[in-house]
Regions:
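Core AdoMet radical
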Residues: 1-40, 51-68, 82-110, 157-159
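Well-ordered, non-membrane alpha-helical segments in soluble/globular domains
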Residues: 2-14, 40-50, 105-111, 140-148, ...
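Acidic (Asp/Glu)-rich catalytic clusters
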Residues: 15-21, 48-54, 74-82, 115-119, ...
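Active-site-proximal loop/turn and secondary-structure-junction residues that shape catalytic pockets
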Residues: 32-34, 65-67, 91-93, 130-134, ...
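Distinct, well-ordered alpha-helical segments
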Residues: 38-46, 69-78, 138
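Structural recognition of alpha->loop->beta junctions
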Residues: 81-83, 142-159, 236-259
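Conserved C-terminal portion of the radical SAM core fold
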Residues: 108-169, 189-219
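Auxiliary Fe-S-binding modules of radical SAM enzymes
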Residues: 165-296
Length: 296
């Protein structure tokens, strides 16, 4: 990919969307880092930063922690003093980062990067993973709650990404051999309920003065076998409620949710610590209904 290719793509995007006229936000994700000098030419980085600043559009980029340095941020903020940097932290736990995710950096690296971003008055978006490989449902819920609490005060936004199954991956092999089940939607609801007081100390909603951060959850393939799901009967209602909460930050959006399969999850979590293998795998992974659903 040459600089000319990147400039061409950028110019076509601006032309297609009329300089992003009806858009308040522009996300430039390169599946790594816009600030990676070895892959992204400096002149293209500068163009993106300056164009979004001149157009008065909120710019969101991704970066790995090692690309966030004093020198780099000093340079970048000269071209755009107000943008958001999203970091895929995945887990606020060095053991999980090393043995479950193989992330390649530690939480101290994330802490250092966030301190620098805050020094330059840049916004921080933190990605967390819910139920990474080799983790039971109960552990995923416990860790997920703790990680959200740990990063809330240092993050303007927290995006929790429930594990989904992509073909050709290690997690796909575990899934096909009945050693991993994507997370339950009920677990995501429980995580929201347990962390809401840390996001909104006065039980407010998004936009209120008490808001510490914003919690966002949009389950990829939600309600499907390879994404976060319940029994199949209540999935659409629960996914819709989770997504409404992500917009509003109001617990009222989770009221009225009910299904018998919630009891199956509670039993699964209660037995997690006493069985050699986690429950919730195999053909019965959906819970009470659709027991003969085949893997896809």
């Amino acid at each position: 990919m040459t600089a000319e290719n990147l400039f061409s793509q950028w110019d076509k995007a601006k032309a297609k969307y009329h300089n992003f006229k009806d858009m308040g936000m522009v996300k430039v994700y390169t599946s790594g880092s816009l600030l990676e000098d070895k892959e992204i030419p400096l002149e293209f980085q500068q163009r993106v930063l300056e164009d979004c600043h001149d157009l008065k559009k909120e710019l969101v980029i991704e970066s790995r922690t090692e690309q966030i340095t004093e020198e780099k941020l000093e340079w970048a903020t000269k071209h755009n003093p107000n943008f958001t940097v999203a970091i895929g932290l995945e887990a606020y736990d060095d053991g999980v980062l090393r043995f479950h995710v193989n992330k390649g950096f530690s939480i101290s690296s994330w802490d250092r990067a966030v301190e620098l971003l805050q020094k330059y008055a840049l916004r921080v978006k933190t990605y967390l993973m819910f139920k990474p490989p080799f983790m039971s449902e109960g552990d995923a819920l416990l860790h997920g709650v703790n990680w959200v609490k740990a990063v809330a005060e240092k993050s303007d936004e927290i995006s929790v990404n429930p594990m989904n199954i992509q073909k050709g991956t290690i997690i796909d092999r575990l899934y096909r051999s009945d050693q991993f089940r994507p997370p339950w939607l009920w677990s995501l609801v429980s995580m929201i309920e347990q962390t809401h007081a840390f996001i909104h100390p006065k039980n407010g909603i998004n936009g209120d003065e008490d808001q510490v951060s914003r919690l966002i959850i949009h389950p990829t393939a939600g309600g499907k076998p390879r994404g976060a799901h319940n029994c199949g009967d209540c999935d659409s209602d629960v996914v819709a409620a989770i997504e409404r909460y992500s917009v509003s930050g109001d617990l009222i959006d989770l009221e009225g949710l009910s299904c018998q399969c919630k009891e199956v999850l509670q039993e699964e979590i209660s037995l997690d610590g006493s069985l050699p293998n986690p429950l919730g795998v195999g053909l019965r992974r959906r819970g009470l209904s659709r027991l003969n659903l085949r893997k896809t």
